[in-house]
Amino acid sequence: MFRARLTHAQRTGMQVADCQSCVHLFPEDGSDMDAFPADAQAFVHRFFPTVARLTAQGFEGGPTIKGQFDAAVVHVPRSKQLARHLVNWACQLAPDGIIYVDGAKTQGIESLMKAVKAITPLMGVVSAAHGRLFWFHATGQFALWDASSLREIENGFKTQAGIFSAEHIDPGSAILANALEPLSGHIADLGAGWGYLSHHVLSEHPVSSIDLVEADHAAASCSRLNCDDTRAQVFWQGIDSWKAQKSYDHVVMNPPFHEGRKGEPDLGKAFIRKAAGILKKKGKLWMVANRHLPYEETLSQLFVDFRAVAGDKRFKVLLASAPRNTRL
């Protein structure tokens, strides 16, 4: 929606000066980047599918970026702490330029704008398309918003701002870990996050190897620290783009089911299809999901047998065995 709000701002008198270079922090679509009048556009994003999509569209960027820019656009993410971190980072990337901050009301743009306004004057604000766009001159006064450092939570696990369950062990993952039967052989952890499940498997089960697949670059980096074991290998990949190099005896996973703030059960179903395609003939899938999510039909289509083996009022642990000749 950045394009819509920027267009509205220009129609109502906002002057956006042409500049040679602009960096976008956490854009979701190349059309939003194209909307900004700059000769060269770059981006920062840590979600692999988005990085791959924007790179394929001809934009330069990735989880980190070097250099300085004439302007920066912050596309506000869901995480409050990450959003503040991006504002500070934008000021570092465009220290002499204008910082544009865009987001939907459901993303917390109102509270972020108030926090920015308390530190530095705003140059302008527009409201459109259920969100806001505001802008200000870059300043070094946001240094306290930096959240690039790792944090240590319970049991010494390392996490970082903006990743899933950054403050504590996810309760669904904990239920799944406690429900696992003795595992052995080759394991895959799909959507591994910062590595809790894999750490548990490595600590409690005599496995030969475990491959962690995670799309969030920050989470994947944390998982390398939390699973510092020669049997573990971490892949920063999306579930669709990752190509397994072997078949697995077990897959463990706590798949995501949100696209932004909207629940998307199809995300979890894609994970189930991936698991069915990489398991051995007698392999097993262990997964945890929110109790209301409708995964049973997909499991019955792709596996010879499945059943619920644990859970509580919020979560269910599902065990599926013997994929039905499904190969990706």
Tell what function each PLM region has.
Residues 71-80, 190-195, 248-262, 275:
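Conserved proline-anchored active-site loop of SAM-dependent methyltransferases
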Residues 60-69, 236-243:
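Short acidic low-complexity segments
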Residues 96-105, 282-289:
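Conserved beta-strand signature within the Rossmann-like core of class I S-adenosyl-L-methionine
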Residues 120-152, 290-328:
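Class I S-adenosyl-L-methionine
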Residues 1-55, 171-253:
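Conserved SAM/SAH cofactor-binding pocket of Class I
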Residues 84-97, 269-281:
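A short glycine-rich, Lys/Arg-flanked "PGG" loop and its adjoining helix->strand segment in the class I
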Residues 127-184:
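SAM-dependent Rossmann-like transferase core, predominantly class I methyltransferases
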Residues 46, 104, 214-218, 267, ...:
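Short beta->alpha hinge that forms the Motif I/post-I loop of the SAM-binding pocket
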